[in-house]
């Protein structure tokens, strides 16, 4: 009966390509004991509440890392001493195959041992009986493969996540290729939007075309919810409603990235709305061009500093230094009488306009794991309470405690400047307080820039031994403008 199950869906173009077993070996080398059994469950099929329809499937990333399998309802074990990776697949169901088509079966066992799920409990019992002093490594205490009955299982849930995070943060060449493939799809989608922008009337058309291009190029979709914010919506860091008209607005912030074989891209471009440009030129206002130029400089200088051994926190600080210099030139920031530039820096006044971290790790998750983070990865581009984030409140790699950048890391570099009305009003209300950011802001000048909304430019960058390699090819700068205006 197993012959009915003939399709194996894995990352890459063939079953042999994704280096899952090599990943399992790397993980084992980081564990405290070089013997034991690693167990990881894949994502199970889950029905929506009060429905017979399954929720959209997203494979568990730790499971995928050692298998490359994107089928639901699977499990995997890795016997460290025997170097044996065993994939457990759902028991064959003829009726299910008639309804949903062939799925993963035992016959597709190239470079891995495959069993049906019904044998998992017995296999674990036999392994534990034969290795009574060796641990079964699990990610979380509630992810045990079987309920203990007569066997005293030795579960260990403290080491596996740290070991897997240490491995996942350094990408091998195959993983880099998948991230680059995701970026190529993203680049094609961004190009299509720029070329058609003059025909669009609303944000939904921008977001819709991005998804359309991703799917047409055989991506499974986007790595995260698309952000297509026009005008003041571009000043909301994670604006995802994408349902407002473009008319009367100057700029769009498009933060959108494709996924390829479970690997993410994360790309942001900011561009002028052609219908808002009057009397020739490329920009709807001098202010929009000025802010774009500043952010472009911030990104270019920060990317040039990305290399093995560099501290990302220092690069993040450089982005703020550039912002400080340029915002002082424009008169947006000021040094009041009795104060110094050092006071402005101490107050972190630039965080009013640049309220997020410079970037984050990228990989199987868009906000990927950090080395030995011990926590679920958090988005560095999320504002803290009151819409402002201190430069000391970011998560890795934007922290003083984060380790230096290492070859094989993939990080985003995404500086931005935003004129968020809520944040500006709050700073104005608090400007008389001695420790406020508002003391250093010229609010009359700021009003000229509010209609710009926001500008963010984001690329995905591979750290190499000799510097870095930019994996993102979505147009920006002059190439972006030429596409918009058909030149």
Swiss-Prot record:
CDD domains from the UniProt entry: Prolidase
Keywords: Aminopeptidase, Hydrolase, Manganese, Metal-binding, Metalloprotease, Protease
Catalytic activity: Release of any N-terminal amino acid, including proline, that is linked to proline, even from a dipeptide or tripeptide
Cross-referenced SUPFAM superfamilies: Creatinase/aminopeptidase (SSF55920), Creatinase/prolidase N-terminal domain (SSF53092)
Cofactor: Mn(2+)
Annotated binding of Mn(2+) 2, by residue: 255, 266, 458
Details of cofactor binding: Binds 2 manganese ions per subunit.
Pfam family, any one: Peptidase_M24
InterPro entries, sorted: Aminopep_P_N, Creatin/AminoP/Spt16_N, Creatinase/aminopeptidase-like, Pept_M24, Peptidase_M24B_aminopep-P_CS, X-Pro_dipept-like
Domain of life: Eukaryota
UniProt: Mn(2+) 1 binding residues: 266, 414, 458
Catalytic activity, EC: 3.4.11.9
Record PROSITE patterns: PROLINE_PEPTIDASE
One GO-annotated biological process of the protein: proteolysis
GO molecular-function term, one example from the UniProt record: metalloaminopeptidase activity
Similarity-based family: Belongs to the peptidase M24B family.
Known function: Catalyzes the removal of a penultimate prolyl residue from the N-termini of peptides.
Protein's UniProt name: Probable Xaa-Pro aminopeptidase MGYG_06974
Organism: Arthroderma gypseum (strain ATCC MYA-4604 / CBS 118893)
